[in-house]
């Protein structure tokens, strides 16, 4: 789940509680209109929200990583997964991968590379640069479902870690507050004793 997204909980008339998880938003990049339509269809069948672009340059514009010239410099833009073809004119899928991993806003977003060529050095190069997976075309529905499940598991784990971190911070803040209160109580008690002692000394002089 991307930062800022909310998991909706719906209670039907019968009283049974159901949890509706937000759909994954996938940015699909491919210069081939046929391949673009195929991956879009597979993603939609897998209940994903899909945005398609025809080049690496357009992908950078959509993500707002083109030096501020893009049309989607939106602070609330959420992309859960980027799927890109490797061989594209201009900016290749490999170059796009590097640009994404160099950015502060999208470096944590998983990137999957697609290619019709099974070239081992190319695959190793992409994985080394941080690609989540390297898929051979034609991409199958089973590939898309497997990737989706992997992303959802990763995001669920990240949410769990964030939740534990927040709980630990709250506990630490609570302990600090309690310690500060105890120190104040000790100081108040010490001050009261000192004032009582001074009063007794004054009365004894009188």
Swiss-Prot record:
Keyword Nucleus part of the UniProt annotation: yes
Subcellular location: Nucleus
GO BP terms: cytokinin-activated signaling pathway; regulation of DNA-templated transcription; response to cytokinin; stem cell population maintenance
Region (Disordered): 165-206
Post-translational modification: Two-component system major event consists of a His-to-Asp phosphorelay between a sensor histidine kinase (HK) and a response regulator (RR). In plants, the His-to-Asp phosphorelay involves an additional intermediate named Histidine-containing phosphotransfer protein (HPt). This multistep phosphorelay consists of a His-Asp-His-Asp sequential transfer of a phosphate group between first a His and an Asp of the HK protein, followed by the transfer to a conserved His of the HPt protein and finally the transfer to an Asp in the receiver domain of the RR protein.
GO cellular component, one term: nucleus
Keyword Ribonucleoprotein carried by entry: no
Keywords (A to Z) from UniProt: Cytokinin signaling pathway, Nucleus, Phosphoprotein, Transcription, Transcription regulation, Two-component regulatory system
One function term, GO molecular function aspect: phosphorelay response regulator activity
InterPro entries named among the record's database cross-references: ARR-like, CheY-like_superfamily, Sig_transdc_resp-reg_receiver
Modification 4-aspartylphosphate occurs at: 85
PROSITE patterns: RESPONSE_REGULATORY
A Pfam family annotated for this UniProt entry: Response_reg
Family: Belongs to the ARR family. Type-A subfamily.
Function: Functions as a response regulator involved in His-to-Asp phosphorelay signal transduction system. Phosphorylation of the Asp residue in the receiver domain activates the ability of the protein to promote the transcription of target genes. Type-A response regulators seem to act as negative regulators of the cytokinin signaling.
UniProt protein name: Two-component response regulator ARR7
Originating species: Arabidopsis thaliana
Gene symbol of the encoding locus: ARR7
């Amino acid at each position: 789940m991307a930062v800022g997204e909310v998991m909706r909980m719906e209670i039907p008339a019968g009283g049974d509680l159901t949890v509706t998880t937000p759909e994954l938003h996938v940015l699909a990049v491919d210069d081939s209109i046929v391949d673009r339509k195929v991956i879009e269809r597979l993603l939609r069948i897998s209940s994903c929200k899909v945005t398609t672009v025809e080049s690496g340059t357009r992908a950078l514009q959509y993500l707002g990583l083109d030096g501020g010239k893009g049309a989607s410099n939106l602070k609330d833009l959420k992309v859960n997964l980027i799927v890109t073809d490797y061989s594209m004119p201009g900016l290749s899928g490999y170059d796009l991968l590097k640009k994404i991993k160099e950015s502060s806003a999208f470096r944590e977003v998983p990137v999957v590379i697609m290619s019709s060529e099974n070239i081992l050095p190319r695959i190793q190069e992409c994985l080394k640069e941080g690609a989540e997976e390297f898929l051979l075309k034609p991409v199958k529905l089973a590939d898309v479902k497997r990737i989706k499940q992997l992303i959802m598991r990763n995001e669920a784990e990240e949410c769990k870690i964030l939740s534990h971190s927040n709980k630990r911070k709250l506990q630490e803040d609570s302990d600090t507050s309690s310690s500060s209160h105890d120190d104040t109580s000790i100081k108040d008690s010490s001050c009261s004793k000192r004032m009582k002692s001074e009063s007794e000394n004054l009365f004894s002089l009188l």
